[in-house]
């Protein structure tokens, strides 16, 4: 080492050129490779700290149960009790995730939710609206298409596959997502006793879903399809995913009614006297207990993984009319906007709205059937609309719905 080399040293740590791997010259001094690495690690730590602080700021934006409920009110008519249950359950779930709560004494469980209500009462819409408000990935599956692994049909883990696809395989995002499983009542076991034959689409699916809903590290094929040994898997922690299951549970009301009805019998031939006032479906569903769900065909372990039960009520005529007109994305508003693109005003009379609601009730399709009714009423008009010059207004009245007459056109 020359005397000149001895004079060269790091301006930060003082080490000479021979003591380090590299010495880089600046305008008025030198810096060694070790100090560069130290500065780099300090910058990384600072960057990570800024990211953590930014994450904390975002965590503070978690909407309160009141705010969640208010957002649901903008898009879903009625179902006040179900909205309250959902708002509290969702808030508690994401509060648990965002605070990373840890305690040796208390373990916070997952607030998975079971929605019970008739077809077209808003179960799917509630789940979708929640995910949109919280800005988290959302995936939906139909329980009737699911089977146990190894059988023909969709594996239960395909539900996780859909969630990953919806957030471009970002596992961190997916683990904060919401999965809605519809028609969950259709996977009830076929009988209360143990089955000799394998029930691959009933109790078998319930067993397969148990681990996912409770929380497990699932291995998901990155491009879908069946697993094979050579394929690299994506690991997903399902303990952070909120599962919402929904179903109509036709017949559950009879099970609840049988348990809750008061009856008196005196003598050998006495008749059972029921309450004079017949309870509504929603009133019965509000009284549901785990034993009722077990008798319906859900296994105890599965019921235990869905601690929050939110019953939905049947929609009456007034509720259906409100669904047509009140929400931010109400059907009538959507079609009025569509006609507006053609510079044409679309108007529905109050009698027409009432007739459409009545028709949906007769079909027993709830809110779900309203779109098909409106679509059928306006089909011919929408077909001709671009060709009708100088058309100013289209009026749909009661005769259009009841007598299948064409809407009135004003030029």
UniProtKB/Swiss-Prot annotation:
What GO cellular component term, any one, is given?
Answer: HslUV protease complex
Q: Name one Pfam family in it.
A: ClpB_D2-small
Q: Which InterPro entries match?
A: AAA+_ATPase, ATP-dep_Clp_protease_ClpX, ATPase_AAA_core, Clp_ATPase_C, Clp_protease_ATP-bd_su_ClpX, ClpX_bact, P-loop_NTPase, Znf_CppX_C4
Q: Please tell me where ATP binds in this chain.
A: 118-125
TM ranges are none
Q: Which UniProt keywords apply?
A: ATP-binding, Chaperone, Metal-binding, Nucleotide-binding, Zinc
- The organism's superkingdom is given as Bacteria
A GO molecular function assigned to this protein is: protein dimerization activity
Q: In its UniProt record, which GO terms are filed under biological process? A: cell division; proteolysis involved in protein catabolic process
Q: Where is coiled-coil annotated?
A: none
Is the keyword Transcription regulation assigned to this protein?
A: no
- Which residues does Zn(2+) bind? 10, 13, 32, 35
Q: Where is the ClpX-type ZB domain?
A: 1-51
Q: Which SUPFAM superfamilies match?
A: Glucocorticoid receptor-like (DNA-binding domain) (SSF57716), P-loop containing nucleoside triphosphate hydrolases (SSF52540)
Q: Which PROSITE patterns match?
A: CLPX_ZB
Work out whether the entry's keyword set contains DNA damage: no
- Please describe the quaternary structure of this protein: Component of the ClpX-ClpP complex. Forms a hexameric ring that, in the presence of ATP, binds to fourteen ClpP subunits assembled into a disk-like structure with a central cavity, resembling the structure of eukaryotic proteasomes.
Kindly give the HAMAP family that the UniProt entry links to this protein: ClpX
Q: What protein family is recorded?
A: Belongs to the ClpX chaperone family.
Q: What does this protein do?
A: ATP-dependent specificity component of the Clp protease. It directs the protease to specific substrates. Can perform chaperone functions in the absence of ClpP.
**Protein's name according to its UniProt entry:** ATP-dependent Clp protease ATP-binding subunit ClpX
The organism encoding this protein is: Haemophilus influenzae (strain ATCC 51907 / DSM 11121 / KW20 / Rd)
UniProt gene name: clpX
């Amino acid at each position: 080492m020359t005397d000149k080399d001895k004079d060269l040293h790091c301006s930060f740590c003082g080490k000479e050129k021979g003591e380090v791997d590299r010495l880089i010259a600046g305008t008025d001094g030198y810096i060694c490779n070790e100090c560069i690495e130290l500065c780099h690690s300090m910058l990384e730590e600072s960057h990570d700290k800024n990211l953590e602080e930014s994450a904390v700021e975002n965590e503070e934006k978690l909407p309160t149960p009141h705010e969640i409920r208010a957002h649901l009110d903008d898009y879903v008519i009625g179902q006040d009790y179900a909205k309250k249950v959902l708002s509290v359950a969702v808030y508690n779930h994401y509060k648990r995730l965002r605070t990373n709560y840890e305690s040796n004494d208390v373990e916070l469980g997952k607030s998975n939710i079971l929605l019970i209500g008739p077809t077209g009462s808003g179960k799917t819409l509630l789940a979708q609206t929640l995910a949109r408000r919280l800005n988290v990935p959302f995936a939906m599956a139909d329980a009737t298409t699911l089977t146990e692994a190894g059988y023909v049909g969709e594996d239960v883990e395909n539900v996780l596959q859909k969630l990953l696809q919806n957030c471009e395989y970002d596992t961190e995002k997916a683990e904060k997502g919401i999965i809605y499983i519809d028609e969950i009542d259709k996977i009830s076991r076929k009988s209360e006793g143990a089955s000799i034959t394998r029930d691959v689409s009933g109790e078998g699916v319930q067993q397969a879903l148990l681990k996912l809903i409770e929380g497990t590290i699932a291995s998901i094929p990155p491009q879908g399809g069946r697993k094979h040994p050579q394929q690299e898997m994506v690991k997903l922690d399902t303990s952070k995913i909120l599962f919402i299951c929904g179903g109509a549970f036709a017949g559950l009301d009879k099970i609840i009614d049988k348990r809750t009805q008061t009856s008196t019998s005196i003598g050998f031939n006495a008749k059972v006297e029921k309450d004079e006032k017949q309870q509504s479906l929603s009133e019965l569903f509000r009284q549901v207990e785990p034993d009722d769900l077990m008798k319906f065909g859900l296994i105890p372990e599965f019921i235990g993984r869905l601690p929050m039960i939110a019953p939905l009520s049947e929609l009456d005529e007034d509720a259906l009319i409100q669904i047509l007109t009140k929400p931010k994305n109400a059907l009538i508003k959507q079609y009025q906007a569509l006609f507006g693109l053609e510079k044409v005003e679309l108007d529905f009379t109050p009698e027409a709205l009432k007739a459409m609601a009545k028709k949906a009730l007769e079909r027993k399709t709830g809110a779900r059937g309203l779109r098909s009714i409106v679509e059928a009423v306006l089909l011919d008009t929408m077909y001709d609309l671009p060709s009708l010059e100088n058309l100013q207004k289209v009026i749909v009245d009661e005769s259009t719905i009841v007598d299948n007459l064409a809407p009135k056109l004003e030029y």
